[in-house]
Regions:
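Amphipathic alpha-helical "coupling" segments that flank catalytic cores
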Residues: 1-173
Length: 173
């Protein structure tokens, strides 16, 4: 997914993937889960090799809630998109969907985060093609279900931005 999103040549996305979750093992994050990412950024900024990805480590969880800020730079944008797509594709591929008001894996939040980053940061991304390429072939329905799930969130996002139902339907179809 990182290659599809074109992380950029100046930052090694493999280094990012290797250390972006290292703070989850720390006692600090274990005791204060809200510091997830924040502590990772602090740890990374202490190592000259990883200083250039410290901000992205903190930002790749964003947005964490409705109205939260978006990542501060393009690498953070791409890292957040990769994180959210990986979560959605992984869970939908094993038929883990939100039901009713239950969403234990925050899949709705991840989908809305993808939509906000793509639209508000003006990122050109064919998420339908990305899903087709990375969804396991043994679960053909999961890709269609995931696309419908994201389109439903996109529809609601656009309506919240005062687009009419006709305008939204024209864009989504």
């Amino acid at each position: 997914i990182a290659k599809e999103l074109k992380f950029g040549e100046s930052i090694n996305y493999k280094d990012f993937a290797l250390i972006s979750k290292a703070d989850l093992l720390s006692l600090m994050v274990g005791e204060f889960p809200e510091l997830q990412g924040v502590m990772g950024a602090i740890y990374a900024s202490e190592d000259a090799q990883f200083k250039n990805i410290a901000t992205a480590i903190e930002d790749h969880y964003k947005p964490k809630f409705s109205g939260d800020s978006l990542p501060r730079d393009s690498f953070g944008d791409y890292a957040a998109l990769a994180e959210k797509f990986e979560t959605l594709i992984g869970l939908f591929s094993i038929n883990e969907y939100p039901t009713g008001d239950k969403d234990p894996f925050s899949l709705r939040r991840n989908a809305i985060g993808i939509i906000r980053i793509i639209i508000e940061k003006d990122i050109a991304l064919n998420f339908s093609g990305l899903i087709d390429k990375h969804m396991p072939k043994d679960n053909k329905d999961a890709g269609s279900i995931l696309k419908a799930f994201i389109y439903e969130r996109l529809s609601n996002y656009l309506k919240d931005k005062n687009f009419t139902s006709n305008e939204v339907d024209a864009v989504i179809s």
